[in-house]
Amino acid sequence: MRFLAFLLCLVPLALCIIEPRGIDGPTSHEAPTDLPIDWHILSQAAGMAHEPYCLFGDIGDRVGDAEVLWSKGHGVVIQRVKIFHSKSLGVTVSFEGTTASLLSILHDVNAALIDPPKEVAPAYCEGVKLFAGFSNAYMELRDEVYEQIVKFQKQFNDKRVTTTGHSLGAAMAVLAAMDLNKRLDDGIYRSFAFGMPRTGNGAFANDVDKKIGGRFFYIVNGRDWVPRVLPRELGFQHPSGQIWINPPSTTHWKYYPGQENHYGANSEDPILTFDDHHGIYFHTGLGHGPGKCPASVGTA
């Protein structure tokens, strides 16, 4: 846990070097509703989101209804990524969250808002800005991930493509979803982001809503502080699609429509520990401690 404490200590430094921009998007006041998606699907996505944390075991491993097909990286120089074929979600790519690697941690604190790299710019509308470190982490894996996805789509005769991830991996998952939605003929099927930090500006949030809204969901567990960074006052904004598990690691979950819903996770002060960031999501352990290796689905 020492590297996680170190990461937490770096957040004030990141805040000091970013120019305040003001709140850059709406605050929804819509009432919460029941989930618009079967929680069993969310449980499956959570299991696949955890699997990149598992170093040992790999190709052929089963995670719920999915089989690991391909993996790359050890979480040191680049984030680990794994691709599955899931009966319920199709060809699924999952990105690892922050590791003890200095390079991984630096992705989290490189918090400047930048224009999308030229390779992915066609996926976005004018005015979109991305969290630099998260964008860089995705770009390091982008081309090879795309090649593998296309290969496995053909191999399994399955057009469905899903992205998932936890923490830093969640940010990479939404960036991948936007990119793949543009590059793939049939777009993406679903995208799930567990414990996702804010990944772009208001234009980014609007673009996500416009292009993959209804297929993208981000999940907050209790008073997890990670989805609250970086602050909205610095120009960062979550898209729509929040599912809030509260109390944490329980079966009490609701969907909070619109961006930055007033009644959702923003309504409670975050706790400055990782107890809620790593937790039980839809009966599946995810993150350091609650998650096990190999990953499992629906066993927590």
UniProtKB/Swiss-Prot annotation:
Protein keywords: Disulfide bond, Hydrolase, Lipid degradation, Lipid metabolism, Metal-binding, Secreted, Signal
Domain of life: Eukaryota
Disulfide-bond pairs as recorded: C54-C293
Protein name per the record: Secreted mono- and diacylglycerol lipase LIP4
Active site: S167 (nucleophile), D224
EC annotation from Swiss-Prot or TrEMBL: 3.1.1.-
Name of a matching Pfam family: Lipase_3
Organism from which the protein derives: Malassezia restricta
One of the GO BP terms on file: lipid catabolic process
Gene: LIP4
Residues of the signal peptide: 1-16
InterPro entries assigned: AB_hydrolase_fold (IPR029058), Fungal_lipase-type (IPR002921), Sec_MonoDiacylglyc_Lipase (IPR051218)
Family that this chain belongs to: Belongs to the AB hydrolase superfamily. Lipase family. Class 3 subfamily.
Subcellular location: Secreted
GO cellular component: extracellular region
